[in-house]
Regions:
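Active-site neighborhood of glycoside hydrolase catalytic domains
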Residues: 357, 362, 386-394
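Active-site environment of divalent metal-dependent phosphoester hydrolases
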Residues: 156, 228-231, 260-271, 332-334, ...
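Metal-dependent phosphoesterase/phosphodiesterase active-site architecture
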Residues: 20-140, 144-158, 162-211, 219, ...
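Active-site neighborhood of phospho(di)ester-bond hydrolases with catalytic His/Asp-centered motifs
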Residues: 148-150, 190, 218-225, 257-264, ...
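Short acidic, glycine-rich surface-loop motifs adjacent to enzyme active sites
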Residues: 222-230, 358-378
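Well-ordered, non-membrane alpha-helical segments in soluble/globular domains
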Residues: 238-247, 347-354, 384-389
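Core catalytic region of metal-dependent phosphoesterases/phosphodiesterases
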Residues: 188-190, 195-280, 284-287
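Fungal secretory targeting signals
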Residues: 1-20
Length: 612
């Protein structure tokens, strides 16, 4: 029966929309709920395309009705998210063909259906051929340090005593009378909770800890995501307030300069970064203006490029180091503006700009750190964009010292390779360091202090500092302490313990080989991703896929596939059960549509069990 339905849907897709009647809200809900194949997802897009002919509001109304009826989220969450993202979906489905590359990619995002299309062949053009040079050896001079932190997600309206176990996607506000202080069984403490974003008290403690443990830091890299996760409530005003308040807090507390980047949550609607030339009332210019103004204290006139498209290149004073901050939202799969009839190879010409900056750095014999929000190898990265960046990184691997990202909320690393069919210590070409988060939704709050060679800017060690929420005195004030040193932890696995030796790409590849043969070492690494909060084990396919992800700074090789018809249950938000993290890795609307589909699958499973 499923096969016959899929064939019928495929035939329907070829009929076009010219004579298509307006689909009813019930029809749209039924199609979303029953989607279990790529063909059926295309049918959903086909119906949305037909609805979009009657205006954006027709799409908004149908999706909102479906969300509420299915119980995918509370009514206010359904209305808030879909009112913001629904018009973008309407515009997208109006402008793309179904089926097409763009529509199938959209299906992987909205309903976790369809296989990700293969990367389109496209060679990046470089001004000069790659010279015969390699990474410089450590200078042996006295090391220096800097700080890397990410995903602060400060909730300016966090309410002490409000419920930390609410019905919303994120808690610790008085959404209902039963959530108010004194009316609930899980009151939020003054310094945060795993089901909530960061209160101001935690943010202030965080910056003070950086000053305490890294008083001589030359600078800090902040890899983005300032606003809280209440995506159904955000607007330009609230996001602007959040960005300005957080960067002001950094400026007033930290003596070190902070070099920032744009996260997906810095936009309103969330994830929404239209490209240049898009004729639409929704524009990214306001957020580029806000962040460039916030960054100007530390990067001065270089903030002008940030004002244009959220990226900049900055030479750190009195050093040979250039920091290049990328806007990874331009190849982020939950940015619904990327799905065009003719999907761009280089949105806003950012990759062309990056090549020019790296060529200038190579010519001047500068060292470079590349930073951005989303790691290019994760499942959230569009494969084409990730491939283009990987080409650039491998061309300039002797100039780039390391790369830095956030977004996942978990402490990890990724490796780039010059030959993806021969992964070895000899072909490992670049290391990406992925920072843990301040927000405690995926583990204990944490930041990293990196020890570096002052000439080559190669990474000599990475030390993580954290404040476990499970400490009995945590709510009296976070107890910050050293959590782990990369060289102390992993150096002994591969025979590299010399403090002056660099943690090269070859070193990190050898660590992944040690993970394969030493399961205790791997399980300890897996636990450290959440700073010890998630005590589950990762074996079999989980372990294989985790190591595959580490070795895949280019996303097409990360071994991940869409999670089709996965279970979704609000009960998993209860205290102690919300371990998955990666809250940044989902569009609010996509999560709603997938919840509708998975809830229907759960009902079918329960019914089948009853019939047995």
């Amino acid at each position: 029966m499923r096969r016959l339905r899929s064939l019928a849907y495929a035939c329907l897709l070829t009929a076009g929309t010219a004579s298509q009647e307006r689909p009813s809200d019930d029809q749209v809900l039924t199609e979303i709920a029953s989607t279990a194949s790529c063909a059926e997802c295309r049918t959903v897009l086909f119906s949305l395309k037909a609805l979009a002919r009657f205006g954006d509001q027709a799409v908004v109304n149908a999706l909102t009705t479906g969300c509420i009826r299915a119980g995918a989220e509370d009514e206010d969450v359904c209305k808030g998210i879909i009112a913001q993202e629904g018009p973008i979906v309407a515009r997208t489905v109006r402008n793309i063909a179904i089926p097409s590359r763009a529509s199938d990619l959209l299906c992987t995002v909205l309903l976790a259906q369809c296989d990700v299309p293969k990367v389109r062949p496209h060679r990046i053009k470089f001004p000069k051929p790659k010279p015969n040079i390699t990474r410089p050896a450590p200078s042996g001079q006295k090391p220096t340090i800097f700080v890397h932190f990410s995903d602060v997600h400060v909730d300016l309206d966090y309410e002490v005593g409000s419920s930390a176990n609410c019905s919303k996607p994120i808690c610790c506000r008085s959404f209902t009378p039963s959530d108010a202080p004194g009316n609930n069984s899980y009151p939020a403490g003054p310094y945060g909770n795993h089901n909530c974003d960061s209160p101001k008290t935690l943010e202030q403690s965080f910056y003070n800890a950086m000053e305490r443990f890294a008083p001589d830091a030359k600078f800090a890299l902040f890899t983005g995501d300032v606003p809280e996760h209440h995506v159904w409530l955000v607007n330009q005003s609230s996001v602007t307030r959040s960005i300005e308040d957080t960067y002001q807090e950094m400026s007033s507390t930290l003596r070190m300069p902070v070099y920032g980047t744009l996260g997906n949550h810095e936009a309103a609607p969330v994830n929404s970064y239209p490209f240049k030339g898009v004729v639409d009332p929704i524009s990214s210019q306001w957020v580029y203006d806000v962040v460039s103004n916030a960054w100007s204290k530390w990067i001065g006139k270089e903030s002008r490029t940030a004002d244009e498209y959220g990226a900049y290149s900055y030479k750190v004073p009195n050093t040979n180091l250039r920091i290049i901050s990328l806007n990874t939202n331009l190849f982020y799969k939950f940015n619904l503006w990327v799905y065009e009839a003719d999907m761009q190879y280089d949105p806003n010409r950012q990759f062309k700009w990056l090549v020019d900056e790296l060529q200038s750095a190579e010519d001047a014999r500068e060292r470079v750190y590349i930073m951005g929000h989303m790691p290019p190898g994760v499942n959230d990265a569009l494969h084409d964009g990730s491939n283009h960046l990987d080409q650039i990184v491998n061309r300039y691997d002797a100039t780039i010292a390391a790369m830095f990202w956030g977004h996942t909320h978990k402490e990890s690393f990724e490796l780039s390779y010059s030959n993806h069919s021969d992964l070895s210590h000899e072909t490992a070409s670049m290391v990406s360091y992925i920072s843990p988060s301040l927000t405690p939704t995926s583990g204990s709050p944490a930041f990293r202090v990196l020890t570096v060679d002052p000439v080559t800017f190669g990474i000599l060690d990475v030390t993580t500092y954290s404040a476990p929420l499970e400490h009995p005195k945590y709510q009296q004030g976070p107890m910050w302490s050293k959590y782990a040193s990369a060289k102390e932890t992993y150096g002994q696995l591969v025979g590299l313990t010399d403090p002056s030796s660099e943690l090269t790409p070859a070193f990190w590849h050898n660590v992944t080989e040690a993970f394969e043969s030493d399961d205790d070492a791997f399980q300890a690494y897996f636990a450290r991703k959440s700073r010890g909060w998630d005590n589950s084990t990762c074996t079999g396919d989980c372990k294989k896929d985790e190591i595959c992800q580490i070795r895949a700074a280019e996303a097409q090789y990360n071994c991940q596939v869409p999670n089709r018809r996965f279970p979704s249950d609000k009960s998993t938000r209860k205290i102690g059960l919300r371990h998955d993290g990666d809250e940044c890795s989902s569009s609010g609307l996509a999560a709603i549509l997938q919840s509708i589909s998975s809830k229907a699958a759960q009902r079918q499973l329960r019914q089948a069990k009853q019939e047995l």
